[in-house]
């Protein structure tokens, strides 16, 4: 005879096996949970219609005019040396005029607040030191009341592009054009942008 506790254990194991076998015969309902689609927070920024060269914008007592654009395949520096672009590139020169129309002195916008656009591609300025042309990066950083300055910005762009492919941008409150942004999560993406066509 088996002791009682061994009999109980044997019955328990048998019951467990019987339950497991009968459970495999039952069909299991599959539950599919579909997560709701996440809201698309990203919007495509619509850029303003570009102005023609020589038109002026006013932003917080600054008058900014893009006077003209010019493409060159080389230039003479103010040190009387000749500079040529890297392979497959050319120099784009943007002539701008700024005036402090406010009642107090103001900081000159940093060069990073200017860009040239070709579609979604953005180019930033670099030093030029072109002979007989005032370099924007060499200007003093403070403009007194009523002061006006005119200077040139240099951009290195692909040689295949023409003036009609390009737009000049003034970004007074940001350093790059943000084409895709979430206005609620990224309010900086909605900073003002002023555009000019580079072609006359």
Named regions from a protein language model:
Residues 2-11:
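Bacterial N-terminal signal peptides that target proteins for export
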Residues 11-19:
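Bacterial N-terminal signal peptides
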Residues 21-200:
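Conserved functional micro-motifs across diverse proteins
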């Amino acid at each position: 005879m088996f002791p009682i506790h061994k009999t109980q254990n044997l019955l328990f194991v048998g019951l467990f096996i019987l339950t497991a076998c009968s459970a495999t015969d039952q069909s299991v309902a599959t539950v599919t949970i579909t997560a709701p689609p996440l809201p698309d927070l990203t919007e495509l920024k619509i850029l303003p219609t570009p102005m023609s060269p020589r038109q002026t914008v006013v932003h917080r007592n600054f008058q900014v005019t893009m006077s003209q654009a010019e493409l060159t395949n080389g230039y003479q520096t103010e040190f009387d040396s000749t500079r040529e672009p890297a392979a497959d590139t050319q120099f784009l020169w943007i002539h701008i005029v700024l005036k402090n129309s406010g009642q107090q002195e103001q900081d000159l916008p940093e060069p990073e607040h200017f860009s040239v656009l070709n579609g979604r591609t953005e180019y930033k300025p670099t030093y030029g030191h072109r002979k007989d042309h005032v370099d924007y990066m060499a200007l003093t950083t403070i403009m007194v009341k009523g002061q006006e300055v005119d200077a040139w910005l240099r951009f290195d762009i692909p040689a295949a592009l023409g003036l009609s492919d390009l737009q000049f941008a003034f970004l007074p409150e940001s350093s790059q054009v943000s084409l895709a942004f979430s206005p609620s999560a990224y309010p900086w993406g909605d900073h003002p942008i002023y555009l000019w066509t580079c072609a006359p």
